[in-house]
Structure formats: structure tokens, C-alpha cells
């Protein structure tokens, strides 16, 4: 199995409810190491650029508004097959469809306020990590 890195965001709905530690515990208890982490308040420009792939989708403006509504925690997670493992731990985007025990089943409020974002591929993980972190900020 390959050791890889993935990118994660703990979203405003979760930071607002002080769930960062509980979500971090899920990652760590399931074989993912947090090798970089910082709490940030996204600007509208940052959120629009980060989610630019969704610009033409009907939910884009609501997504950006939500992501700037409060602080987020951006993270680099490392472990065996980290991208796939993180996606398993997060659960389905819609918390009503998420398997019991997943982060979204436990903590999400709605399909929009679903507590976490995770990279969908190793390629996108590299892009997303570079968007928020300099190489020197990642400490394995």
C-alpha cells in the first residue's frame, strides 16, 4: 500500500460547534496522520478560486457564502491510501446517505453544511495542498 497525502477542510459548521478535535480524532484513530494544519478565515476570492471548478454549477454562490461564513481548518493528512481512506471516513456528501459512523453521519447538519471536504484524487490533493500550504509547513 502506498503512503500518500490528501487535503482536508473542516468546514464552518463544524468549527462553529467546536468539532475540530473530534474530527481530528477520527482521522488519527483510523490511520491518518495530520502533518499540517491551520485555522483560517477564507476570503471570498480564496473560496471562489478554490471551488472554481464548480463556478458554473447552480450551488456555487451558496457554497462560497457558506465557506466564508466562519473559520475553517485546512489540513494535510498522510497515510496508506490517504485519499481513499479519508473519503471513506467522511462518508457520502449527503449526510442522510452517509454510512453510520462516518464523519458526515455523525456531525453534518445538511448536504451543504456537511462538516468536511476531502480531495477526490491524488492529483487534486497535490493542487489543493499547494493552494494552502508551503512545503516547509508540512512536517512529517
UniProtKB/Swiss-Prot annotation:
Its cofactor is Mg(2+). GO terms for biological process: CTP biosynthetic process; GTP biosynthetic process; UTP biosynthetic process. It holds the Pfam family NDK. This is Nucleoside diphosphate kinase. Its EC number is 2.7.4.6. GO terms for molecular function: ATP binding; metal ion binding; nucleoside diphosphate kinase activity. The active site is at residue 117. It catalyses: a 2'-deoxyribonucleoside 5'-diphosphate + ATP = a 2'-deoxyribonucleoside 5'-triphosphate + ADP; a ribonucleoside 5'-diphosphate + ATP = a ribonucleoside 5'-triphosphate + ADP. It is found in: Cytoplasm. The keyword Hydrolase does not apply. InterPro entries: NDK-like_dom (IPR034907), NDK-like_dom_sf (IPR036850), Nucleoside_diP_kinase (IPR001564). Coiled coil: none annotated. The keyword Signal does not apply. Keywords: ATP-binding, Cytoplasm, Kinase, Magnesium, Metal-binding, Nucleotide metabolism, Nucleotide-binding, Phosphoprotein, Transferase. Major role in the synthesis of nucleoside triphosphates other than ATP. The ATP gamma phosphate is transferred to the NDP beta phosphate via a ping-pong mechanism, using a phosphorylated active-site intermediate. Its main location: cytoplasm. Homotetramer. Belongs to the NDK family. It comes from the Bacteria. It is an enzyme of class 2 (transferase). ATP binds at residues 11, 59, 87, 93, 104, 114. GO terms for cellular component: cytoplasm.
Amino acid at each position: 500500500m502506498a503512503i500518500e497525502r490528501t487535503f482536508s477542510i473542516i468546514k464552518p459548521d463544524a468549527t462553529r460547534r467546536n468539532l475540530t478535535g473530534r474530527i481530528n480524532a477520527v482521522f488519527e484513530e483510523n490511520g491518518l496522520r495530520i502533518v499540517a494544519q491551520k485555522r483560517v478565515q477564507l476570503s471570498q476570492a480564496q473560496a471562489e478560486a478554490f471551488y472554481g471548478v464548480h463556478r458554473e454549477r447552480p450551488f456555487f454562490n451558496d457554497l462560497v457564502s457558506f465557506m466564508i461564513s466562519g473559520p475553517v481548518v485546512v489540513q494535510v493528512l498522510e497515510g496508506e491510501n490517504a485519499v481513499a481512506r479519508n473519503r471513506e471516513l467522511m462518508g457520502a456528501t449527503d449526510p442522510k446517505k452517509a454510512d453510520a459512523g462516518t464523519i458526515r453521519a455523525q456531525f453534518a447538519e445538511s448536504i451543504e453544511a456537511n462538516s468536511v471536504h476531502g480531495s477526490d484524487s491524488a492529483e487534486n490533493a497535490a493542487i489543493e495542498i499547494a493552494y494552502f500550504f508551503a512545503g516547509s509547513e508540512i512536517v512529517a
